[in-house]
Amino acid sequence: RGSLAPPDATMNRVNMLMHLMKKETLDGKPLIEHPIYRDRLMQIQGKVLAQQSHALRLLSAKLNPGTDVKIGKMIQKLTGTELRHELEGLAIDVMGEIGTLYEDSPHLKNDGTWQFIYMYFLGLIIGGGTSQIQKNIIAERGLGMPKEPKVEGA
């Protein structure tokens, strides 16, 4: 599950996004120079660095016999897929109206890779177990919280 959005691949996409933000302009200025876009990028960068640290923690935990990394992997899956979707979504926003194009438009940038990957990670969020289900599993199994009560007659 954790390999669905490896942090090093995510950092590579961040670097590609930074390159895109240097090329795309708004009011004659590259988007990387606009505080709102730059702030969103920095938030994503911080999350990726945290994910890389978490991945190293999981790797070192595997070296210690008896260490359970199941919950850590669930957290990695949850945060990894959500983060990739957020990152690809920023790229869509950076491209403006061209970011909304999909499939066979002659105006696509990078053959529509950003749009495809955006939808791919949306599918992983849904298909790999919705984020809410993942959060419930982490809460119940990892934190020992009680299961949600069942409503009678529902």
Regions found by a protein language model. Give the residues of each.
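Alpha-helical scaffold segments in soluble metabolic enzymes
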Residues: M16-L20, E86, I137-R141
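Short alpha-helical scaffolding segments that buttress acidic/His motifs in well-ordered protein cores
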Residues: L41, Q45, A55-L58, Y118
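Catalytic-loop motifs flanking and including active-site residues across diverse enzymes
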Residues: A9, R13, K47-A50, Q76, ...
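Secondary-structure capping and boundary motifs in well-ordered enzyme cores
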Residues: E33, Q43-K47, D68, G72, ...
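Alpha-helix initiation and N-capping motif
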Residues: V14, H34, A55, E88, ...
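Glycine-rich beta->alpha junctions and the first turn(s) of the following alpha-helix
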Residues: R1-Q51, L124
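Glycine-rich phosphate/cofactor-binding loops in nucleotide/flavin-utilizing enzymes
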Residues: R1-P7, I98-A154
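C-terminal helix-coil-helix/basic helical segment that borders enzyme active sites and/or dimer interfaces
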Residues: K22, L26, P35, L49-P106
